[in-house]
Amino acid sequence: VKRPMNAFMVWSQHERRKIMDQWPDMHNAEISKRLGRRWELLQDSEKIPFVKEADGLLLKHMADYPNYKYRP
C-alpha cells in the first residue's frame, strides 16, 4: 500500500506536467530540483489548497487502511 501524497507531492504532480510540456527533453532530476525551489518560494497562503487536498487524502487513506503502518 502506498503512502498518501503530501502537499508538495500534490502540487508537484500538477506542476511537473506543465514543465514537461514546456521542456519535454529536460531530465527528471532537473525537473525535481526546479520544483523544489519553486515550492520553497511559494507563500504559505499559496500552499493552502494543496495542504487541504493532502489532508483529505490522508483522512481517506486512514479510513481505507485503518491498521496501516509505514514500513520502508
Curated annotation (Swiss-Prot):
Predominant place of localization: nucleus
Biological process (GO), any one: brain development
A matching Pfam family: HMG_box
The keyword DNA-binding belongs to this UniProt entry's keyword annotation: yes
DNA-binding keyword on record: yes
Keywords, ordered alphabetically: DNA-binding, Nucleus
Signal sequence range: none
GO MF terms held by the record: DNA-binding transcription activator activity, RNA polymerase II-specific; RNA polymerase II cis-regulatory region sequence-specific DNA binding
Alphabetical list of InterPro entries matching this protein: HMG_box_dom, HMG_box_dom_sf, SRY-related_HMG-box_TF-like
Location in the cell: Nucleus
Gene3D superfamilies: High mobility group box domain (1.10.30.10)
Any Gene Ontology CC annotation: nucleus
DNA-binding annotation, residue ranges on this chain: 1-69
Entry-linked PANTHER family: SOX TRANSCRIPTION FACTOR (PTHR10270), TRANSCRIPTION FACTOR SOX-12 (PTHR10270:SF221)
Protein's name in the database: SRY-related protein ADW4
Species this chain originates from: Alligator mississippiensis
